[in-house]
């Protein structure tokens, strides 16, 4: 945006995509959020996305369609559901902490910090019994999914009708879908035979309703949505949590101040015992928001097509059917909205500061805001508090450089946090 301005466009294969980093234009765009059109290939991500995630709830559009697709899932990701899983979050966090080495650089990606989130969401979707017996299968399927989705970055897969051809990429998409369907049907068969319990999990209750035609979604929509919820969006939670930890390791004064707040308020208690950590630990909320501002989990929001004959954004007239994305990095680092945006200053999110609406893009905006954001926030809060209760954090080998991913979806952040070093308090 420094080069092209707050509203610009790029070519994505043969498709022009409008990019927004202007808060007013973003607010204008999202006031009509329900009507925005999302196609099964997410407008420009191509055959791989369409084949694996094309019918997930994220692709729904229109008020009735969004309610139809999101409705069966919402109660499982409500504030009540998240509160009911706080014990699981605490358990999985402590189990992860017990695996970490002391006094040597830790690569949080290699150490599988993301498994804290993956295990919690597995429990929410399938219940504890499946978590304990079949988690290794879910990890294998996650690897298979990410390896397949990485093929989105091959330009030819975005060509029209690519999915009609017998290619190696399309065979990999089919192989994942077959493996994912087979695994989930296997679990439901065990459930029907009484060999495993559902534990009130989303999957078994929803599949049972599908069998009786009591829902307006079908099995493919359910499985594509579980791809998104369980396997894909784990990367978003990992980015938020890992960068929060590395930011604290790099900014010792902030770490000291936050630890003092934690010690004073919680008095050594397990953070997962509290459902209102955001209200109890106000400085921590500032820290987490500032970390999310500087390291947004999504480099670009998912594209949404305009539906009006002309949509005016930032003084430009955008024709009908044009994909639009939010450039979160440019927005979150804009000097228009943030003083000294390259500095880590949690106080900019204090209650006394007025944040310009639309200038901070974290979990999306509007009625299609990330379904699992409550879980993501709860997990990040518990993990950060637990780390600071047990450890002093430092940056690995004085290396503040951010590592760049070699693989991954183009709209996720391309960065991985630097290594950290732990010392027991």
Regions found by a protein language model. Give the residues of each.
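Cytochrome P450 heme-binding "Cys pocket" and the immediately downstream C-terminal segment
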Residues: 254, 375-411, 415
